Amino acid sequence: MCKYAKMSLFVLLIVGATFFAYYNHVAFGPHFSLSKTNFKRLPYWEYDDQSQALLAFQKSCVDILKREPSAAFSTLPQSKSNQAWQTICLAANKLSHSDKMTAQQFFESWFEPYTVQDNFNPHGLFTGYYLPLLHASLKKSKQYTVPVYGLPADLVKVNLSLFGSDFSNKIIIGQLKNNTLVPYPDRTAINSGTLGKNANVLVWADNAVDVFFAQIQGSVTVQLPDHQSLLLGYASTNGRAYTAIGKVLIQNKVIAKENISMQTIRAWLQGHPEQVNDILNQNASYVFFTVLHTQDPLGMEQVPLTAQRSLAVDTHYIPLGVPVWLKTKIPEQRPVERLLPYHRLLIAQDTGGAIKGIIRGDIYWGAGEDAAFAAGHMKQIGRYWLLLPK
């Protein structure tokens, strides 16, 4: 989704984010270590139905098959060349309607697992994100007054890596004024109408809080009054620094840190409508959207995400397209609120502003109330193993 997730919901509400371009340039160094293991040592490997993971991997293959065959897949020594992955993808694409056993045999035949460690520590933080629902209209009215903007015509992105290796993975965003690149307007200015005709309004929403949370997620399903729907995806940010409103509310001592979640923040904002604009404007960062013509939101590979099979990672360490065996715990709301063990094969398909670190992941939960609950409450320690070509 290229969310703030992307873009961890929990962490973004409390900490913040920075945006980077996607490259499979992995910072393989003294703190990042990989050690080969075997599938028998992956906890509960044999119990997962990996047919859904195979479908997600086939989506990543759409991107992988477009890459230059002779180039390295990433700077990870064990990841081999694009050609090696393309051979695997061609084999994967021959498998249609695969069952659990066939999918498991596929991954075991083509890959071998590697334990990931950060300075000899295999554990890290795992969170979640989801696809929210936004009630909106194509026309402005008394009910629908909050604009959801498309990409402004005057927004300029500069890829600094084109100017030298010192600026690798750095992008700045602004606008030209008198032949000088200056920062793009912040959230306060945008909400005051400064964009004018530079940005099209894609839809008009009925709730500023819902628009704000849609920006955090990076994609949103729009429910129109005639019951038709649109899928909006991330187009760009305004380039301004991100300030987490959860952190603001904690500092203002209106919500205790241990109680912070998407749900508690939303409830507080709904209970204090007179303070909504002031709180939201504390975050200068603003997200612009584009209309997607796909059934599911797109990840950084520009392929559709799969609920509970797509993982946002830090591409400084984990290349996109890599299968990842994850062990952690997840929140469940029904029948009672509790934590459940979670062992599942996912595919690294997305990135996020809050997803930073060697062992760090953000599970895409899909849409609906249960997905919203999981994404809003998930903040668990876990570990993962990379599946790399034999």
Predicted feature locations:
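Targeting-peptide/extracellular-domain and disordered-appendage signature
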Residues: 20-21, 47, 62, 66-67, ...
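Secretory/export targeting leaders with adjacent low-complexity proregions
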Residues: 33-292, 301-303
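Compositionally biased, intrinsically disordered low-complexity segments
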Residues: 14-17, 149, 333
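Ser/Thr/Pro/Gly-rich low-complexity linker/stalk segments immediately outside membranes or between
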Residues: 25-35
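Positively charged n-region of N-terminal signal peptides that target proteins for export
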Residues: 1-6
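Hydrophobic membrane-insertion alpha-helices, especially the h-region
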Residues: 8-22
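C-terminal soluble interaction/assembly domains
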Residues: 35, 46-49, 293-390
